[in-house]
Amino acid sequence: MNRVAPLLAGLSLAFAQAPGLTQVAPPNIFAQPSPLPFGAPPFDRIRDEDYQPGFEQGMAIHAAEIARVAANPAPPTFDNVIVAMERSGAMLQRVEAAFDAVKQADTNPARQTIQKAIAPKLTAHNDAIYLDAALFARVKTLWDGRAMLGLSPEQAQLLKIYYQRFVRAGALLSPDDKRKLRDINTQLSVLQTAFQQKLLAGTKAGALVVDDPARLKGLGDGGIAAAAEAAKARGLDGKWVVPLQNTTQQPALASLDDRAVRQQLFEASWTRSVKGDANDTRATIAEIAELRARKAALLGFPTWADYVLADQMAKTPHNAEAFMARLIPATAAEEKREADELDATIKAGGESFTVKPWDWDRYADRVKKARLDFDGDAAKPYFELNAVLEKGVFYAANQLYGVTFKERHDIPVYNPDVRVFEVFDRDGKHLALFYCDYFKRDSKSGGAWKSSFVDPSKLLGETAVIYNVANLPKPAPGQPALISFDDVTTMFHEFGHALHGMFANLTYPSLNNTARDFVEFPSQFNEHWALDPKVLANYAHHYQTGAPIPPALIAKLRRAAKFNQGYALGELVAVAELDMQWHALSASAPRQDADAFEAAALAKTGLDTAHVPPRYRSSYFQHIWSGGYAAGYYGYLWTQMLENDAFAWFTAHGGLTRANGDRFRDLILSRGHTQDYDVMFRAFYGKDPDIEPMLADRGLLPVKP
């Protein structure tokens, strides 16, 4: 997850130098740079009551700095406009980065109250910058005369990004339309915050609660103990709780023996945000979609999707839809084949029902066991979380890029589950700090993500301070964290994002931000190393005996990685299409009934959503309603095409080698947004993206017409 306001990258003046603000007391902890190494947030000293005044002071200082840039009587130059804005807003960036971490990963009622209060103020603050006519006039003067400025390629790219950012924010609108835009932006900030908080509460309230552990048969002793611990954490002694994950399907569905309990758990997930209570999100998302369509129209775009994709790698909704259309025939055919096979398996077992979504994972596992002799639970003893992290994720990065890691116990964290590592570059010098927060808790939003406390910048003399968050099952006290291979993949995925941030070799902090249909490229590419023979041999050892994972089990893991791909791809394509259709609404369209719209949108896909529901339902699709992926979820599929092409290149050139890693780092990971995305990709791959390696990686063949 990237920062809300990309301009907030640095501050050249101390707090006491801001005109009219020298008497503010008491001094806020965010007013000065952190005294900790590398600017790490001092979480041991930050109190909840520091955040709101920190935001208020930070916005005031930033506004004063921007006002000086706009009112500068000197002719505009790259330094006194663009560089000055890059240097501005350090206090606001510090408080925003720290608060973003705790509001997402460790929230509480006080933090939720602050979030509600601050969100519209931040929106108004950013509008005041981007809709400032005098400031834009200086940016536009530079843009119009850019050919005469003698800018370096990186400077020219930054100027282009700033000009486009102002235009996309409404700088060319009339005063009346700017007023309308401000109003829409404020409403959206309030609604997006409301959605996020309703979803968190609804997900917690929607957990499966049972009175008898016998109903959880199939989860195993460890799973049942974890359910008891989850109940205890909620004050439900004597009960057992299976918390909901953020996705439609729930991990426990593969294991639960009782079909009625499986259905109950699935329906708890599917209905978590549509119960007609205070946590129902349907009216909220319909209003968000309507406001986005109105905003797009104000800015001269037919739809929100057209607005969003104008600065993405795909360029237009048509291109994104055409790409997904190429996936649907093979996906739909494989979905049907898989469903038929599951029905046959159910019938062969003497049962009379046909497969439903709550049955799919369980019976897919049976088919997998029968066909591949593979049991995912049998692999878990070889995937102990700490070993996966230090001997797998870190080891792969060392082999590819030469980086090394040392745990830091002196850096304060926002929750006891968090660990911190210092990262050293191939020359032994400091590169970054890396925080990891892997276990699920009720105070944490669902899913997994990467974000940063500090972005690297030569201009500001700063190195990366980055964190990964996930929602892996927390073991009972005293038990090892044995995780599934899917969870292993999640750890490699999120660390791919982290590497992208750590390796950014940029002068200007704004160039750290990349498009949604490019940013998932390094993360999904990094997943491949989880099954690399050399990497796997280093981390996959039995947690008790130390024995390496047997070659036969490795072979089964590899075959299993291509199993059930109709479902895996189908749930992604369905939800990406759902996102695109919500954001293909025009400003003239009436406000939608969320349930009816969703049903119609899914029917249009041509996919078997009755058996293979979308990965997220509209009502709990956090990525698009509060996570920055609106009209961008297709990017997960688009970047699978990119990363499979890249991995095919690696395979053809020797695989896991430092030479290959250094080339990927130089041409992709270090570049940020210093070049157009298609230019960067062609420089590495040698040609435009090709969908065939993606389909081959999933074991799918294109369906011939």
Regions flagged by a language model, labelled:
Residues 24-50, 217-218, 234, 239-241, ...:
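C-terminal, non-catalytic "cap/extension" segments appended to globular domains
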Residues 473-492:
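Short pre-active-site segment immediately N-terminal to the catalytic Zn-binding motif
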Residues 35-50, 99-118, 141-183, 243-283, ...:
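Short His/Asp/Glu-rich catalytic/ion-coordination signatures at enzyme active sites or charged loops
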Residues 158, 197, 202-243, 291, ...:
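Active-site-proximal, well-structured secondary-structure segments within enzyme catalytic domains
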Residues 68-77, 304, 407-410, 510, ...:
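Surface-exposed patches in mature extracellular/periplasmic domains of secreted proteins
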Residues 5-16, 20:
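Bacterial N-terminal signal peptides
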Residues 12, 23-221, 650, 705:
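N-terminal helix-rich structural modules
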